[in-house]
Amino acid sequence: MPREKPRADEIAIEMMSVCEDETEVEQDPRELYEEEMKEQQQIDCSKQQKEVVAIEELEKRNINKHFFSIQPNTQIPVISSNYIAPVDTSRLLVLIGKTKATYPIMKMFSLSVLAGMLLSVGGLLSITIGKGIPSSDIGIQKIVFGFFNSVGLNLVVLCGGELFTSNCAFLIPGFMEGAYSRWLFFKTHFVVYFGNLVGSIFVSTYFGKLLGSFESPMYLSAVKQIGETKVAMNWGRALLSGIGCNWLVCCAVYFSASAKDLLSKLVVISFLVLTFASLEFENCVGNMFLLSLSHMYGGNFTLGQWILNNLIPVSIGNFIGGTFLLGIPLWYVHVSNVYNIPFLDPLYQQSQAKTQ
């Protein structure tokens, strides 16, 4: 039998039902978003409640199990808005190094001259205050000298100057990652080193000698003694002292990069500079100011002795300390792919076995 054609009224009823279904399905996006947010809040609240219950049960079980209530294999989260994690700070060094290495040469030179001048201001202040203390109180004299010497590095960091010593740690991670060429790496070190020398000698000449800041007998003998003692140091001691100095200097600048607020930056830099200055470690940029000032005030040494006996070994030591004691370790641990040793890394062995 031939199939009957649907009537017009039946077709209209079906179309109306379909439209009603579609209107029921379609909802306001705001309502959907609010419903999703409510569901997510309920899930988060339930998770937090479960975590609180789990922590309370764990504390009840292990309250007397370990000495001083220290529980092994438990992670304690540290939440601070004023602190950047070491991993993130170390990865940031790659970007900082690339930025430094790709500066236009005049900008790089200007920032390095500024850094040499600002660091020398700290040297002026430390001599004026530290060497004014009687030499019988040698411990207090070293502490005061080191504390006010930190003013220079604080000014350099806050003004964004280019310092050879801190660049030893800040340039190597980006270079190891291939962010810039070998030519840019060595060019940056050379330009910054020369700019620091120009800035340091300018301050020692203008503010130190021409203004007669240290012509009194007490300061005159102290300034001469500083230069003569540094030049009389043997090559090996100057090299090792330079390594230790720049290790601490680079730590100070690195830790200041991980701090977000100004006070934290000033505190960490001041204490680490106080440490290396009190220990009488050698800083090549600081010595550019101190030895040039001592030479201008009649220190018993020649320019050749200054360069050969102090500037060269201390500069090499500073490069080793910043590059190999901080820059490369930070890059290896936090930036590079960790090189697993098969017979010492069980997780590496398991992953290799699964792939095979």
UniProtKB/Swiss-Prot annotation:
Main localization (coarse): membrane
Topology in membrane: Multi-pass membrane protein
Location relative to the cell: Membrane
Extracellular-side segments: 130-142, 204-237, 287-310
Entry-linked Pfam families: Form_Nir_trans
Entry keywords, A to Z: Membrane, Transmembrane, Transmembrane helix, Transport
Keyword match Membrane: yes
Molecular function per GO: high-affinity secondary active nitrite transmembrane transporter activity
Role played: Monocarboxylate-proton symporter; active in acidic-to-neutral pH range. Transports formate, acetate and L-lactate.
UniProt protein name: Formate-nitrite transporter
